Amino acid sequence: SRGLGDVYKRQVFNLWAMMYEEGEYTIRHSHFPSDFSAVYYVDVEPGCAPVLFEVPQNDGVNHKCETFTLQPQNGMLAIWPAILHHEVPPTKGRRMCISMNIDKGERK
C-alpha cells in the first residue's frame, strides 16, 4: 500500500515560534487553505492552556461542533487538518511552541 508520503512531496510553507505568557491566548481560527497544521511544544509549564479544536458533526440538518481538547506536553508534536478551527484560551502557565503549515505539494 502507498501512503501520502509516497504520492506527494510535502512542503512546509510557514513556520513561526510563539511564546505565551500568563493570560495570553489565541482567538478561534483555522489555517485553510493549507492542507495540514502542526505544532511542536518546546517548553510548557504546568497550567498552560490546552488547544480547543472544533470538530464538525454535520448530520445534514444541524451544523454542530464537538470540542476536542489537546493538552500540550514537552516534546509533543501535534498534526491536524488545517481546516479545523481551534483556539487557545488564556493560559495560566508559560508555553513555547513552534507552529507550521504543511501542504501536500505537487504529486511525485
Tell me what each language-model feature is.
Residues 10-79, 83, 89-90, 95-97, ...:
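Catalytic core of non-heme Fe(II) oxygenases with the double-stranded beta-helix
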Residues 1-8:
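Short, small-residue-biased leader/transition segments that mark boundaries at the very start
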